[in-house]
Structure formats: C-alpha cells, structure tokens
Amino acid sequence: MNYKIGLKLWSLNENYIAPAIDLFEREVYDYIELYAVPNSLEMLPKWKTLAKEHKIKFAIHAPHFSSGLDFSNPNKLKHNLMLCDEVKRYSNELEALYTVFHPGIGGSLNESIRQMKMVQNLKFAMENKPYIVPMNSSEAFCIGADFNSIARILDEVGCEFCLDAGHALCSANYQGLNPYEYIAKLNKLNPKIYHISDNDENAKLDAHMHFGDGSIDLARVLRLLRGGEFLAIETIKDSKDNLDDFIIDSNYLKSIS
C-alpha cells in the first residue's frame, strides 16, 4: 500500500493509548489522526509522551460543527478563532503531519471562506463534506460538498485538500451523480490526505461502517485515490477497551489495495 495509514482517535481517548502503542509497534498503522476535542488541552501531555517515547507521528483534526466550530456562522467567529488557537497548540506541540478543518454547516460559503482566511500561522487542509447532515428536526446543508465550492475554497483560502471518499459518495448520491466518477473528479484537486470508511453505496447520509459491512466498492475507490500521501481509516470503534476492530479494518484495506 502506497499510503501512510492513519488511526483516528479523539483527544479524550485515554482508554486507547495502550492498545494504540501496541498496534504502532506491530506496524498496523503509521500515524494517529487526533480529533482535538475543545477544552481538552490537559490531555496534550499524554499524547506528547506517545510522540516522544514511542516515536508515533500525529495529524490533527480540528473540532467541527458538532463540537461547536462552524466557519459558516458569522455569530461564531470569536468562538471559532478561540477553538483554532487550541488546534494550533495541538498541531504545533505534536508537530502535526497535517491539520484538517471542516468548512461549516448551514451558513454561507462566503462566510466560511472569510473566516478560514483568518486562521493565521497554521498550514491546514479542508475536508469535503456530504451534501446534507441530519439535524434534530430536519436536515442541514454542508459547506464544501460540491466540486465548485470545494475548488473555490482551495483557491481563495490557499489551503490543502483532504478528500473524504465516504463524504464524496454521499454528496454524489444527493446530487444524482455517479459516486465513483465524482470521487475521481475530486481527486483531480490533488488531495494530500484521504479519509475512508464503508457505507451503503446509494447512501446520502454519512456512516462510518467497518469495511465489508457496507456495499461500497472499496477496491475501486482505492484505485481512484492516487497521488496523496495519507489515508486515515474512519470506521467506528466497537470496544472502549481495545482496537481489535481497527486491526481487522486495516488488514482488510491492505488486502484489497
């Protein structure tokens, strides 16, 4: 496999530190993509210990809409930039391979671009989104879900691109496009980073199924994801005590690549 494989964890996942060390030493994965939960800086020294003592590399995923960061909402600018400062701490102190942001949900593309341009002293990538996400009483539209808006963000913000194949599939299905052709089109935007999980091939809503539990042609997807360097596995975790399911997913991916 030509990618560096990423294990997705959250900054509060102290329960996974021991198995993460074990799997790294067994070469099951190459780096950790750490979701920086807001107000969790007290956990940063624990992750720095993994980096220093076990030589584990890190990437950072910034908080997104569900954790309170929404670049598309002008009323959240001050809060968004405060969360960005926490993200910078994680990225700088862990010497992150990359840092990923979502553009926002429910607001305007112009506002997302305006706020993302205000993130200073941090090199980052934007991640493409599904077209819609379920909310409490309805559905909301995501910023950065169609090709033109993604291309515009990359051009005007000047950031890198993280291609989430599952998000792309959901967006394509909502737009009435062939999902595999859409993934191939997005790959022309030269992503450095990929995210992958399984889902129903016709899904419009995102899911993070284990590989083989959905109907996506994952071997075909992997053939389309060419040119990038990092591939983070975003499947669900079944246990709070171990990462055995991640071993299965990682091996599955390697077997079909």
Question: Could you tell me what each predicted segment is?
Answer:
Residues M1-E86, E160:
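N-terminal pre-domain/capping segments
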Residues L50-K52, K76-H79, K117-M118, C142-G144, ...:
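Short, hinge-like loop/turn segments at secondary-structure boundaries
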Residues K55-I56, L122-F124, H210:
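Active-site regions of enzymes building and remodeling cell-envelope glycoconjugates
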Residues L69-E160, D245:
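Active-site acidic/histidine proton-transfer and metal-coordination neighborhood
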Residues L9-A18, E33-K46, S66-N75, P103-E111, ...:
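Acidic-and-aromatic substrate-binding clefts and catalytic sites of carbohydrate-active enzymes
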Residues N39-K57, E111-M118, F147-D155, L177-L189, ...:
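Short amphipathic alpha-helices and their capping/turn segments at secondary-structure boundaries
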Residues M1-Y3, I17-L23, L81, D85-E95, ...:
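Histidine-acidic metal/acid-base catalytic patches
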